Structure formats: C-alpha cells, structure tokens
Amino acid sequence: MAQVPDREKALELAMAQIEKNYGKGSVMRLGDEMCQPISVIPTGSIALDVALGIGGLPRGRIVEIYGPESSGKTTVALHAVANAQAVGGVAAFIDAEHALEPEYAKKLGVDTDSLLVSQPDTGEQALEIADMLIRSGALDIVVIDSVAALVPRAELEGEMGDSYVGLQARLMSQALRKMTGALSNSGTTAIFINQLREKIGVMFGCMNYSTRVTLADGSTEKIGKIVNNKMDVRVLSYDPVTDRIVPRKVVNWFNNGPAEQFLQFTVEKSGSNGKSQFAATPNHLIRTPGGWTEAGNLIAGDRVLAVEPHMLSDQQFQVVLGSLMGDGNLSPNLCDRNGVRFRLLGYGCKQVEYLQWKKALMGNIRHTVRENSMGASFIDFTPLPELVELQRAVYLGDGKKFLSEEYLKALTPLVLAIWYMDDGSFTVGSKRVQERTAGGSGRIEICVDAMTEGTRVRLRDYLCDTHGLDVRLREVGSAGKAVLVFSTAATAKFQSLIAPYVAPSMEYKLLPQFRGRGSVTPQFVEPTQQLVPARVLDVHVKLSTRSMNRFDIEVEGNHNYFVDGVMVHNSPETTTGGKALKFYASVRMDVRRIETLKDGVDAVGNRTRVKIVKNKVSPPFKQAEFDILYGKGISREGSLIDMGVEQGFVRKSGSWFTYEGEQLGQGKENARNFLLENADVANEIEKKIKEKLGIGAVVTDDDILPTPVDF
C-alpha cells in the first residue's frame, strides 16, 4: 500500500509529459469534463430516427448507407443534408457517380445554392477533397456517392482487362484512417453511400458435379446437369423475411473449372435412407444454427440447417408439451436419422381409454401401438425432426426434465389439462365438508418428481403468479417424492380452467360441477417444409472423380438453395471498397425497397425498409419502414402517422385517423395531406413521440459546456 502515492505521482508525471509533448487535453480523466449528449442530424423519417435510437445520424461519425439499386440510399442521404442545412449547417456532396440531380435535391429541401458539390475524376481526388473539407472544421455533413464509383487512378489509367486486386480496398482503408480523427474533432458527419455486389463462384465455393439440388417439387437433380444444360428450373430456397421455404428460379449458371479437392458430407435426415450427401469445395458457405460457415470449418458432430417436413399442428404441439410434463417422453433416434421419437404410456383400462383419446389427437402421425407383459400400453410415433430442439432443451443429461421459463410461457389450458390427467391425483373432501360445500370439494396433488428441483420451483411460482393459485411444493411418502399440493380453492379454480380440455375417461379427476364440459376435437394441418438443425455424420476428402469441375447456380432473390435438403449459399452479397468501411462506420444501414405504392394503376412511390445492421451509439439490429414518394422523397407526414398510431397518439378507426379528437382524414393519403397543411400539428405529434421514446439529444442547454479546443 505504501507504493500507491508513488504510482499516482508517476502517473501525474507521465500525463504532464504527454501534455507537454502533444498539447493540453491530449490525455485526461473522463470525469474531468462534462460529457455532452450525442448531437444528431435528423433523417427526415421519425421511424428511422427511432430505430437509430438517438433521434438521427450521429455527428462526428462515419455512416454507411448501402443497398440494391434504386432502393432509396441517395434520397435518405439528401434528406440528412437538407436537415443539416435547415439549422444553418454547411453540407458537401462528393458526386463520384456524376449523377446528382439538382432539381430532385431541391424538392427534398436541399439548399442547392449553398451546397458544396464536387465531381472528382478519381477515387484519390474524391477522398482528398472530402478530407480537406472535413479538416476545415466548417462542414456539418459530407456525402460520398458512392464508394463503388471511387475508382483508383491506376485503374483508370491502365488498360482494359488489367487486374487491380485489392487496390480500392487499400485506398479506402488509408482514407478512413486519416478521416476518422478529423471527423470527430470537427463534428462532421460523413455519409458513404455503397452498392451491393454478389460474390459468385470461383472465389467463394462451388459444388461437385454429382451434388443433387433440391427442386421446387421436392425431387433432386445433379447440379452439373443443371449448369451444363442451363436448365430453366425452380429450386427450393429459404426466404428470411417470411421464414418460409419457397420456390425460386435459377437465373444464372456457373462452371468454374477444376477444383483441387471436394469435401464429401453426410448429414442425418428423417426420410429416405436417413442420409443427405453432397460434395463442396472447402470455402463454400453452409448454413448452421449460428450462421454461415465455410465447409472446411465443419467436422462430424457439428449441426447444419436442413429442410424437413413439419407435421404437428399447434394443438398437437400442446399435446406434446403436456405429455412431456407427465408420462410422455422424447427419445433420441438411435439410427443416425434426424428426429426424435415421441412416446405415450398408459396403465390399466382407464388409462388405455385416455391413451386412445391422445392417439386420436395425434391421428395423422404414423405410430405403432404395443403392450408389454405387465399390461402397460405404449404408443411410439415416427421420429419427428421438429421436436429435436425441444428434446435438447428438456433433457440436459441428469435424468430429470428441465422446463425453462420459455417452456412455461407456452403452457395453455390444454397443456395443463394433459399434465394433470397424466400425473395428477384428486382427493375428495370428507363427507361433512361435502355437505357444507355446494358441488363438493377436494384437493389436487400433481407429482413433479421427474423434474429438476429448479423446475419444480419455477412451475409452482408460475401457477401462483400467472393463475393466482395457492400451490405448495412438498415431499410425500417414504421415498420423499416431490408433489405440488393445491388448496381447496386452488383446486376448484384450476379444474374450472382445464375442464373443457379433460378427456371423458378422466372426468373422475374433476369435481362434479366441472364434468361433461370436455370439447376437444383433433386439429390437423398439412405438412410444411421448415428448417431444422441436422447433425453432420461424416466429413472426408472426396476421391477424385472423372469430373472435378466446380459448379454453382445463382438463385433469384434469396441467394440460397438446398443440396439434398441441406441449406447452402450461392452468392453472398457484399459491399464494395473492402472491409475498412465496415470497421470504421459507427452506423451501417441496409436500405431495401419492399413494396411499390400505387394510386390506381400508377406507381407513386416505394415502401422502404431500413435495417440498422451496426450501431455503436445505441442498440443495433432495429428496423424502420417509411414511404418514399417519387419527386418528393421521404414522406415525413406518413412516417409520423405510422409512428403515431404505433405509440397511441394517433387513433385509427377503420380508415379514419384521429388526433386528440380532431379528424386528420379518411385514408392515409388524406391524413398525410392534413399534416402537410398543418405543420404545427405534425410538429406536435413528432415532439410527443420523441419525448415518449426519449430520443433526440438536446445540445443547446445552458448547463452543457462546449468542449474546449486548442488551436
């Protein structure tokens, strides 16, 4: 402890030397100065401001806006320019694409007379101009449109066909290293607009000729045959927006020449011979539960995502949940096939009738019924891949069943009824009590000995907190089995809740007044194709074959397909300019056009979705939707209506929109026009939304001191 003063003194000497060498403020304690809230530039869409978490684009940071062509990237950037200018800011636009339309910018609110515009000839020139403007300290926002158009000088001066691998990426990396500090010091926001391109074929993995692609009708075809014949086929593909397996058209075919080697994969599946097989180059991307992974990084025992039929309806899944809490179990498939077996158990004639009732609810699932020498009846259902994750979550290896909080949230009256019918007992009160109690009384006990200790407590608390039941946990008998004991009042309340779901053969477990209410009828659904995890059984280097060429296809829209049921990527989307911009950007926004807005048959705009894929100033991964009207840009009023309805400030009744008793109009277009004509109402709604959500940093308060700057 005697060394502490010496350490403090040494630190003070070091800080003094640093300030002497590099200037005052070059190092300081974070608490020495009052922290300023983050200053922002509004985007023009309240929904996007909310998704960004701070009310707009942060000042002094790099922002990347990327997306497909005609998705609205430049429109979003120009609205930020207009909002910066509206409060007296200075804006610059580096038009590397030479495509800025002044009239359109003016309609969005941009002061084109004072806008600084540069149309550079090379990427180096564009970035040097941007750097010099930023270092002037007079700029509030600069837009570079676009990164893809920042062509290095060497490439422009070279010959057609010359290769310049990584040249633009190195240029961007160097420029961003120089710009980052200057942006922070000057408080300038730099918006980089970026394009999407696809990584196809030779650099990013391919398939062996014999690998079979899953077609839209469920059949398969060799990828080599599809490519060589340029077959016009539709394949199964996963749509992440709708979370569904959908047919998609093959729009391009690639034969990328010979490969050094292929990896042969064997993956478990439920049907056919129980195995999916395919051969891919080590760098081909395969979908796993944790995301995309290169084939060369996978080993036996890892899990990938595969398409399997889903058979269970919501009602049937509830039957499984209730049975798992009681006498049912899920057993792993021991034949190296995907899926787990759901087994039901019953004893005696009453239980057999109850077992038949359960079997009827699962009637569309293939099963076998058997009886052992002791008279116990069993029903074994065919292995179901959709129950694999449930089995992994419930059986953790200690022999007891583990029910998580998420499991308990899924409990319905039907689930509780099946659990009670499986493991519950009902004791009728004494004759004297029966005489005093209309309809009789009794107590329920439900055995929970097969569950973990933590699960027993969670289940008791769930019944108490969610259903208001007086339930105690105790041990009974010489074996000390754990049971949940219901009070008389809780028994009546619980039986009232589950009575409509009790099987006729189990009504003896109910009070007389609750009998005869059962009305459960089987509910079946058509099988659907869904993604489920599947275990990799084997990976090895495939022996050389006659054809060692690499084949790939490009799929419309989703950029993924299935090989013998396993999900693989065909052409990952990426942004231009290397990875430096991903690293240096504080905010990255993925802009997509999701719908065309029409007035009759005429297109009048687009519905746009923006995903915040990176955010270092607020929680990321939020998304916003708003309208972009042709010739007008982002519809601020439309966004206010959407957010107003969502936050409860604007009331929607049928097609009418109302704000504080005042009708805004019938239909969104009329309500939009009302707010356009009544700016004070629009501003009031915006203010209330921002106050409720706590966004929009205030930077003009008297108690906030400006950061001192030494020149």
Curated annotation (Swiss-Prot):
Residues bound to ATP: G67, P68, E69, S70, S71, G72, K73, T74
Cell compartments where the protein resides: Cytoplasm
A Pfam family recorded for this sequence: RecA_C
Modification comment: This protein undergoes a protein self splicing that involves a post-translational excision of the intervening region (intein) followed by peptide ligation.
A GO MF label: damaged DNA binding
GO cellular component: cytosol
SMART domains registered for this protein in UniProt: AAA (SM00382), HintC (SM00305), HintN (SM00306)
Cross-referenced InterPro entries: AAA+_ATPase (IPR003593), DNA_recomb/repair_RecA (IPR013765), DNA_recomb/repair_RecA_CS (IPR020584), Hint_dom_C (IPR003586), Hint_dom_N (IPR003587), Hint_dom_sf (IPR036844), Homing_endonucl (IPR027434), Intein_C (IPR030934)
Domain DOD-type homing endonuclease stretches: 320-420
PROSITE patterns: INTEIN_C_TER, INTEIN_ENDONUCLEASE, INTEIN_N_TER, RECA_1, RECA_2, RECA_3
GO biological process, one term: intein-mediated protein splicing
UniProt keywords, alphabetically: ATP-binding, Autocatalytic cleavage, Cytoplasm, DNA damage, DNA recombination, DNA repair, DNA-binding, Nucleotide-binding, Protein splicing, SOS response
Broad class of where this protein is predominantly found: cytoplasm
Keyword Iron: no
Family, as annotated: Belongs to the RecA family.
PANTHER family linked to this entry: MITOCHONDRIAL DNA REPAIR PROTEIN RECA HOMOLOG-RELATED (PTHR45900:SF1), RECA (PTHR45900)
HAMAP family per UniProt: RecA
Function according to Swiss-Prot or TrEMBL: Can catalyze the hydrolysis of ATP in the presence of single-stranded DNA, the ATP-dependent uptake of single-stranded DNA by duplex DNA, and the ATP-dependent hybridization of homologous single-stranded DNAs. It interacts with LexA causing its activation and leading to its autocatalytic cleavage.
Protein name, entry field: Protein RecA
Organism name: Mycobacterium leprae (strain TN)
Name of the gene this protein is made from: recA
